[in-house]
């Protein structure tokens, strides 16, 4: 388990994973979220790590499904057919 606390207290992120597992669960709490979370808000997403980030990005760009990019963090998001965001991560 890892935990990240914002210096200003605005969020807490907790990462959970089995010791021998390949999967990680990220739980985020936002202090200033105005109401109870509603699943329809799309305040959750899945993230996928790829061995060939550049090729994945090129394919997703060609498909026109990239909805948000954060070059400073080295990540981007695509949308699935239902409009949910999927995070694409480079190798560690």
Model region roles, listed by residue range:
Residues 1-22:
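Core segments of cupin and vicinal oxygen chelate
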Residues 1-4, 28, 70:
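Solvent-exposed beta-strand sheet faces enriched in polar/charged residues
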Residues 33-35:
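Short beta-strand/turn micro-motifs at beta-sheet edges
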Residues 19, 39-85, 91:
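Vicinal oxygen chelate
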């Amino acid at each position: 388990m890892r935990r990240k606390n914002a210096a200003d207290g605005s969020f807490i992120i907790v990462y959970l994973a089995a010791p021998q597992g390949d999967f990680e669960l990220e739980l985020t709490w936002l202090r200033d979220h105005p109401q109870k979370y509603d699943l329809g808000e799309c305040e959750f997403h899945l993230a996928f790590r790829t061995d060939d980030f550049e090729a994945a990005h090129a394919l997703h760009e060609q498909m026109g499904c990239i909805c948000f990019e954060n070059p400073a963090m080295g990540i981007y998001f695509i949308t699935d057919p239902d409009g949910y965001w999927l995070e694409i991560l480079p190798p560690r």
